[in-house]
Amino acid sequence: MWTTWHDNVGKPMKADYVKMVGIANQGAKELGYADVGAMWRSGYDMTPEQFSAETERLWGEVKPLYLALHTYVRRKLNEKYGDTVQPNTGAIRADLLGNMWAQEWGTIYPLVAPKGAGDLGYDIGDLLKAQGRTPIDMVKAGEGFYSSLGFAPLPETFWKRSMIVKPADREVICHASAWDVDNKDDIRIKMCTKVDSNDFVTIHHELGHNYYQRAYNQQPFLYLNGANDGFHEAIGDFIALSITPQYLVQIGLLDKAKVPSADKDIGLLLRQAMDKVAFLPFGLLIDRYRWGIFDGSIQPADYNKAWTKMRLDYQGVTPPAPRSDDGFDAGAKFHVPGNTPYTRYFLARILQFQFYQAACKQAGWKGPLHRCSFYGDKKVGANLNKMLEMGMSKPWPEALKAFTGTPQMSAKPMLDY
């Protein structure tokens, strides 16, 4: 499947992608930028060169943890498949990690779960179904989290105009998204909600966009956005980190007697790391690869060779079969042909833990960070709103300082977690 997908999706678009690069670069130059990559890197209140160095610095902070996770997962895969499929040294085969792009590894958690700690003790989807909760109930629960922090309820139009379940009468794009239609209060989400754990978390994430959009809607038009694009993705993610057993007890989903004991923590943290930590090098390399294409240091003849090398250097993954030099494996990832900047997702992974740790400190949380929930803490909500309502009106370090007390991005909170 891996080979078929990359051969049939990536390779046929290569010629068109080369044309698109030329057209996009021409437009960037007309706007005063050296190329599209420089234009993308200019949106962070620092020079493109400084931003490139900043992201590399952050990667340096988390790389040792990633390498430890990579080594552990590789050993487990070697135990499962043997040396001929997955050796116990070197790179991991990209098709063994449970995701077409090897960007998140959570789906193979059962394969690598530590003995005795693998069962997390509950499944949110099962808890929802046991109580007969509907997709609307799930969105109401998400709204309830933000309301508990002191944010105003969602407007009536949200419930009338959002697409919360897949319509029966037409085809739709089910990829979850959040919308601000009028820069005032016409906020909506669009998703094909299923009653399961993933969509419960996704709802908390998407509503984060909506509450951010609403918070800065008094700003002048040019400031109607997040402090940087990583902030917008991080807001909902950090709220979702607070979907802890304690929170599930607070909203009546989980029986207090069934809260997992501390001996389940290793499993819980590994499951989080399989998505949160495993994603980091991928989140970085998608744009680093394209910056090279846009500035000409990666030529069309070398597209595939450069992609394979960068995946090896950053992720430590390798294709399951030899790849042709005239292919375009990177094109098999939606954001590449879609020309969507991707570093925002790397930044969001870092920032969400900074926001989460700051909120937990403000709430006076004393236990392990990963068990914290600040549900119901109006002080946290007021401090959060101060950052959100700034929109883009201040440089992002000022917005970051307003909530966390520091103007610098740091991966330390993720490591603490």
Predicted regions and their residues:
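Short amphipathic alpha-helical coiled-coil/interface segments
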Residues: 2-13, 17-24, 44, 51, ...
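Active-site-proximal, well-structured secondary-structure segments within enzyme catalytic domains
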Residues: 19-190, 259-272, 278
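Short alpha-helix carrying the canonical HExxH Zn2+-binding catalytic motif
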Residues: 20, 196-211
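C-terminal, non-catalytic "cap/extension" segments appended to globular domains
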Residues: 35-38, 48, 103-120, 132, ...
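Generic beta-strand/beta-sheet core signal
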Residues: 161, 190-192, 210-213, 224
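Catalytic Zn2+-binding segment of zinc metalloproteases
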Residues: 207-222, 239, 243
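Short alpha-helical functional segments enriched in proximate histidine and acidic residues
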Residues: 27, 65, 145-148, 210, ...
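Post-HExxH zinc-binding segment in Zn-dependent metallohydrolases
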Residues: 55-65, 226-264
